[in-house]
Amino acid sequence: ADXQPGDSTDKLLAQKQDDV
């Protein structure tokens, strides 16, 4: 899950998906 740099929301979503 790699979100684009500067996208806090995308990063949070990506991290949550990675945690799953």
Curated annotation (Swiss-Prot):
Main location class: secreted
GO cellular component: extracellular region
Keywords: Copper, Oxygen transport, Secreted, Transport
Tissue note: Hemolymph.
Secreted listed as a keyword: yes
Subcellular location: Secreted, Extracellular space
Keyword Transport: yes
Region of interest (Disordered), ranges: 1-20
A GO term, aspect molecular function: oxygen carrier activity
Free-text function comment from the UniProt entry: Hemocyanins are copper-containing oxygen carriers occurring freely dissolved in the hemolymph of many mollusks and arthropods.
Oligomer and partners: Composed of 3 major subunits (IB, II and III) and 1 minor subunit (IA) which form homohexamers and heterohexamers. May also form larger structures.
Protein family membership: Belongs to the tyrosinase family. Hemocyanin subfamily.
Protein's recorded name: Hemocyanin subunit Ia
Annotated source species: Panulirus japonicus (Japanese spiny lobster)
